[in-house]
């Protein structure tokens, strides 16, 4: 047994030596283009990514224990999903152990500690989240927050835009309370809590009074956002459509873009909430001329807002590339938003986070000064040539080194670690 351990340690040392050698070669290659790889790694380590708690349990939460409804749906029934707060926290801690960098945790209101009590959404207070605040502090994580308009008997097809004053006031009160909870979180962690407002409101079929519902939504938002809270930042999220709400969405992109621009509110860009042929990255520089900040919900749509696991694909790379090219990192907050119940959920987290990190790192390693110079001088051939050549630069060696220096599994090593966790922990959740 001791001999086997020595062999494993020897192999590990050899692999580390190879990673270091590859990094030195990559460092030299990038330096020739005026890019500092050490600085890129340092920036990546400091750039926060907000993990979404709902991947761990398929958006069920701890309020009612029911599957998500209201235009969203998690598909798949892979065993091992978190069934309570302790299991969810255990899974997030496992995810953190396999990642390098800076992370936040994004909570929906339905993930509060309700203690088995029936606390309705217009009654929720910070008391249901003090445990989360303390746990996050112990994990060296900051919290973000979301109001939850779906999966409730009063959800229906309209919440904040509902003409029925009783239902509408219920959701207005809920959202006001969520903002106060977010403010308490921000004060506790000495860092603003980003509070996202997304409502599913819409219609399955042809709608006659579109303007009426949008006016009601505007008035509801005006009332909700009137309360000044210094330790949180509100952001508003649009959507194309939802399941059962295909014909009309009250909070469309045009509605929220106009509202956020007029009222100086942060805008949420969800990469799954656009037409499949749209390039979401194009919206970054356009919106930032008119809104103060952006919240990014990075997902992977498959024909619609299917919330597949984020990958290192063109859409993700283009999004982060545009953030860096537009010098917008200090005005953008990065979060993930997908929920795949068909695969190991810990693995889903790691794949998505690593995809976001790789996309960020590749953007940090771009020879921007040279590219900008070519563009300013009208050297379009040179610009296109360098854009093409940078695709095969050895950024993978830089990402491997980033993980190695933080004592995190390199490459595919995390697969075995997750398989072990599944066998020892997840498989026993029956």
Q: What are these model-derived regions, one by one?
A:
Residues 10-11, 138-139, 176-192, 218-233, ...:
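Secondary-structure boundary elements
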Residues 200-202, 239, 338:
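Short linear capping/connector segments at secondary-structure termini
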Residues 2-7:
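Short, small-residue-biased leader/transition segments that mark boundaries at the very start
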Residues 206-315:
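Acidic/histidine-rich catalytic cores of soluble enzymes
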Residues 14-163, 170, 179-181, 191-193, ...:
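Alpha/beta catalytic barrel-like cores
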Residues 182-208:
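Active-site groove signature of glycoside hydrolases
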């Amino acid at each position: 047994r001791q001999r086997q351990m020595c062999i494993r340690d020897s192999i590990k040392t050899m692999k580390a030596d190879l990673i270091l050698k590859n990094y030195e070669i990559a460092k030299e290659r990038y330096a020739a283009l005026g890019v500092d790889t050490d600085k890129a790694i340092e920036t990546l380590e400091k750039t926060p990514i907000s993990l979404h708690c709902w991947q761990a349990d398929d958006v069920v939460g701890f309020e009612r224990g029911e599957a998500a409804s209201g235009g969203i749906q998690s598909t798949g029934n892979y065993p091992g999903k978190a069934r309570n707060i302790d299991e969810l926290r255990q899974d997030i801690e496992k995810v953190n152990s396999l990642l390098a960098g800076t992370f936040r945790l994004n909570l929906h209101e339905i993930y509060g500690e309700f203690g088995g009590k029936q606390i309705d959404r217009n009654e929720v207070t910070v008391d249901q989240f003090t445990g989360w605040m303390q746990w996050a502090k112990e994990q060296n994580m900051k919290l973000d927050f979301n109001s939850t308009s779906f999966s409730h008997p009063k959800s229906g097809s309209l919440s904040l835009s509902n003409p029925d004053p009783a239902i509408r006031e219920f959701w207005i009160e809920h959202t006001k309370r969520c903002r106060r909870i977010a403010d308490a979180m921000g004060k506790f962690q000495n860092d603003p809590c980003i509070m996202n407002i997304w409502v599913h409101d819409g219609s399955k079929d042809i709608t006659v009074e579109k303007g009426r519902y949008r006016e009601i939504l505007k008035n509801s938002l005006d009332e909700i956002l009137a309360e000044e809270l210094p330790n949180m930042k509100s952001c508003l999220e649009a959507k194309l459509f939802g399941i059962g709400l295909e014909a009309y969405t009250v909070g469309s992109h045009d509605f929220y873009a106009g509202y956020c621009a007029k009222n100086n509110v942060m805008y949420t860009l969800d990469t799954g909430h656009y037409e499949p042929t749209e390039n979401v990255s194009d919206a970054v520089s356009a919106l930032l001329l008119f809104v103060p900040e952006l919240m990014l919900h990075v997902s992977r749509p498959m024909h619609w807002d299917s919330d597949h696991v984020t990958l290192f694909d063109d859409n993700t790379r283009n999004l982060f590339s545009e953030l860096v090219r537009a010098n917008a990192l200090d005005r953008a907050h990065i979060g993930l938003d997908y929920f795949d119940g068909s695969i190991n959920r810990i693995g889903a987290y790691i794949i998505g986070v690593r995809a976001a990190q790789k996309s960020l790192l590749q953007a940090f390693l771009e020879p921007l000064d040279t590219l900008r110079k070519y563009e300013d001088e009208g050297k379009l051939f040179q610009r296109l040539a360098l854009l093409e050549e940078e695709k095969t630069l050895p950024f993978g060696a830089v990402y491997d080194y980033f993980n190695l220096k933080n004592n995190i599994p390199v490459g595919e090593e995390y697969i075995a670690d997750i398989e072990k966790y599944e066998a020892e922990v997840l498989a026993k959740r029956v």
